[in-house]
A protein has these predicted regions:
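Bacterial N-terminal signal peptides that target proteins for export
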Residues: 1-11
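Ser/Thr/Gly/Pro-rich, low-complexity flexible regions
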Residues: 168-205
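C-terminal motif of bacterial Sec signal peptides marking the signal peptidase cleavage site
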Residues: 19-23
Length: 205
């Protein structure tokens, strides 16, 4: 192969490379949504532990106010440009033949053990999750069974401004609590009480 033949084909070989470089560029690209959005519960089974007292790592303000949030989520889009209203209802039939992992039957959280802020959750514009506040009453904390995973609040989405994701339209929300003295304690010979290896459950909002 002579020198002139090689020089003749160098521009032809370089052309695809130049086209590749000019076709690739950085920048923001917008991708279309799926065409519709849906609402759902992220978890169908959930244990919410109300942790009373203080924690240096976790904000327990809601816990000490005996409150927690029941949340729904939206999917199918890259953003939420409006408030999405989700109506729900407590559905005791969701607990039919339901048991915890150890075989203990789930017990419906008595209606006098809690107060719902309403029967509608709102996912605010700009957010993909929103909920309603649940306030636990003194009756809940007076029940010794509440310190164990016993009671469940079964909730089902009944209507929404968007479609409802099938199979994730409900959640079984188990509620329990730990008081500030929960844990393993030892007493020294002089009568002093020392806390050792406390049982700690991370608070989840």
């Amino acid at each position: 192969m002579n020198k002139h033949f090689i020089l003749k084909y160098i521009p032809l070989l370089a052309l695809p490379m130049l086209l590749g470089l000019t076709s690739c560029h950085s920048g923001d690209q917008e991708f279309p949504d799926y065409g519709s959005t849906s609402v759902y519960f992220a978890n169908q089974g959930y244990v919410r532990t109300i942790e009373l007292g203080e924690d240096l790592e976790v904000d327990l303000t809601n816990d000490n106010n005996h409150e927690f949030s029941l949340n729904a989520a939206m999917g199918g889009g890259y953003g939420n440009k409006r408030d999405i209203k989700v109506s729900f209802a407590v559905d005791p039939t969701l607990l039919d033949n339901k048991s915890f992992d150890d075989g203990t039957p789930m017990t419906l959280l008595p209606s006098d053990y809690y107060q719902l802020e309403g029967n509608q959750m709102v996912i605010p514009s700009g957010k993909i999750q929103g909920g309603v506040k649940v306030k636990l009453t003194d009756a809940f904390f007076a029940d010794p069974k509440s310190t164990e995973v016993t009671y469940v609040l079964p909730v089902r989405i009944v209507s929404a401004e968007d479609s409802i994701l099938k199979g994730q339209d409900y959640t079984l929300y188990a509620i329990t609590y730990k008081n500030p003295y929960a844990g393993n304690w030892i007493v020294t010979n002089d009568g002093s009480v020392v806390k050792k290896a406390p049982v700690r459950t991370a608070a989840k909002k």
